Structure formats: structure tokens, C-alpha cells
Amino acid sequence: MSFQPGNLPAVGTGALPPQITRNWLYQKACKIRGLFALPFRKQKTPFFCRFSFLYPSVQRRILPTSGKENKMKKRNIRKTAAALTALALCAGVLTGCGGAASSTASSVAASSATSSEASSADADELAAQNVADLIDAIYVQQRTDDTDAQCEAAKAAWDALTDAQKELVEGENADPDYFGRDTGDASKDDARNADEIGENELLVVSFGTSFNDSRATDIKGIEDALQAAYPDWSVRRAFTAQIIINHVQARDGEKIDNMQQALDRAVANGVKNLIVQPTHLMHGAEYDEMNEMLDQYRDKFESVAVAEPLLGEVGADATVINADKEAVAKAVTAAAVKESGYESAAAAAADKTAFVFMGHGTSHTAKVSYSQMQTTMQTLGYDNVFIGTVEGEPEETACENVIEAVKAAGYTKVILRPLMVVAGDHANNDMAGSDDDSWLSQFTASGAFDSIDCQIAGLGEIEDIQNLYVAHTKAAIDSLNG
């Protein structure tokens, strides 16, 4: 039926109240249809977000996401069905023109009820959109004077939503998982942002993660090991990803210093000797940017030293390996073998099982570190260990290339595990997620393997890795003593 005024049936004499004209009915139908119309929303970029000038190289999404497109499709279906119902009710009113007044009154009542439901649905959308806007406002890579208040406002607005309204939260970067996804107990973590530092500070600088359990076991695990090893130094924390700092603060009320805040705190507390221990994997872009920020504060301390990242010096090409990379290769392989139930990597190989360790990847010249890790694995005799990266840089570490390499080697079982300090978003989503582009899904879709299992564990929880950071810190402290 075409909803145009000229196509509506004539109003029967005395059958409807005089105000129920063809134009009135048409306007009501359009109003109901408009209330249910789904406004176009720009689809957010799946893996990237905008960041400030402070850390321009940080390009990956950090926040947990899962099944968002399916949720939007379901909402579209519900709204389409509701709109069709509303229009059908209006059609019922129209076809009743000229009939009994009681029948018309019932139709008008039904239309009014539907309009009321539409208004309620519209109110839900507005409430959800308000929260989405508040989340988008703090989903940034820089801190402002308004950040604390914005974090509180976003959480308060989220808490005020009903469960149904929470499912409707969609913004440029916002989704229900921002506040709604359970990533563990934040109280197990320690922000390490207290004053009364003393003269000696050991500042542990990490990218960060919004996954509470991983933050406590991986990052805090390293910090605790360093504090135990060096009781005369006060261990403090700094994250370089403001997007994560804001997320944790808004959702859990935990305030973590960014690099600038941590250095300002050190200066205000009269710190004289500063050791900076990055938990970064390599001498990459984040390591460089950390040093650029530190350079602005070096003259405010009597002595400053920066410890090596986990993998140590980069080296000239893929054939150059060092003791740090060898130690990491042994530690992560041993942990993976133990968790999988094998006695050794060789025993796993005999059972046609391959281990795939997924790193982040980078366009920085330090990307050769991943190739060096593959060389290290081969040198150690771990022929069933393969190194890959989310970003696919270096090229041979891209998922499709790793799949082909594992297939060509004849392995029929695969165990995926992150080659990352923290088992956060990348491990849970990019590696083990249910989306088609996750590594688990891609390995499964290849049809080449009998089984694919995932181990969600960061390097930071491995004791031998913690000890390697302790050794790097010792070298930095020794450098201050000449």
C-alpha cells in the first residue's frame, strides 16, 4: 500500500471523528515510521584509532571487542520488524475508514500504543547514544584537564542504563564491551602511583592493557620482581597508552600515570637517581618515543639510566642473535611446552605439533627482531616453533605465510600463543577471537590441521622473563655507579 495522501480511502460519513483525515493518518504513519528508522552510523575502523602527537606510532586498537557487527545486525532486524508492525497498524486504521466507529477507535488506540512504544525505543536510543558520546570523548590518546571528570561522567551514565539500553551503545569507538566486558578483578593490580618515593626511583614503563587479570599477572608481575630484587629503589609505573589509562580509570576507578605524570611526580618528590626500565619487547617506536619524553626531564635528576628492553640490542640482520633473544626463546617455548602437556619441544614435534608465537609486528627498523627470533628458534633446535605477527611485518610473519610454513613442514596440530609481554587485546581477540580474521579462525579455515589450540598467557608472567628484566635493571644501576 502506498502511503500517500491521495491514495488513502475516503473517510466514511460519521464513521471517524472529524479530526481523523487522510492527511492526519498519513502524518501519523510517517511519524511512527520515522521513530523506528535507523539512522546511518559510520562504521568504525576495526583495528585502528587516533592518537596524539606524543605517541604517533601507536596504531592498534586496544579495547576489547567481540561480535559487534552481529549485535548491530540483530538491532537492525528488530527495528525493521517493529517498523513493519507500526505501518501495518496504520494500514489497519486506513482500511477501517468508513467502518464502524468502535473499530476505528480500536485501530487508533493501537496506533497510539505503538507510537508510545516507539517513543520509548527512541528514548533508549538517546540514552545509549549519550553514553557512546561520553565514551568517544575519552577514547583518545591525550590527557586534558577534563579527563578525570569525563571518565566519571561516562561511568555514571553507563551505570544508569538498563541492560537493554547497554546493548544499544554504539559510537565512533564506543561499544558495550567498553564498560561491560569482564576482564578480571582490577583490585589485584597496583597502580604504583604513590608519593614519598625517596631519592632512588625505578620507573617501569609499559604500553599497558585494559585486561585486568593480564595487567596484574604480566605487568605487575614484572614490577613485583623488580621491587623484590631492588628494595632500595622505589618502583613506580607509567603507561604510554593514554587510551588504556582512560579506559581503566573510567571502568575501574584505577588511576595510572602516563609518562609525563610519572616524571612530574618524580621531580615533585625530589628523586635524584632515576632508572627507567621499559617492558617493551624491542628498540622500536615506543622505545624511541619514551626516550624522547625522558630527554625533556634528564636535567632534573642527578643521574638517569635507561635499561634494555626485553630482546636487547636489535642487530644488523636476521642472522644476528644475542643472549637476550636466546633466553626469551627458551623461556616462552618451555612455558608453551609445559602448558600443552609435552615433555619437550622435540616430543611435541614427534606428535606433529607446532607452536606458533604471535607478536605484534612493526614497520620500525626493529622489525628484524622477529626474524632474529625465528633464527634463534632454529639455532636452538626448535624446528616446530614459528614466529608470526599481527601486523604482518616482516612479511614472512603474516598469518597466511605462517600457515603455509606450518603446512609445508608437515605439522597437523597447532598451538597458538602470544609473543607479547601482556596477554591483552591482541591475544584474546586477534589471536584467539571468534572473528573471521583472528588467527584461530584463519588456521581453522585453512582446513590443514586436525586441531588448533590457544594459550592465553603473556611473557610477563614467566619467571625467567621477569629475571631477565631484573638483569637488565641491574646493568642500568651498575652504569650509574661507574
Predicted regions and their residues:
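Beta-rich interaction/scaffold domains
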Residues: 121-183
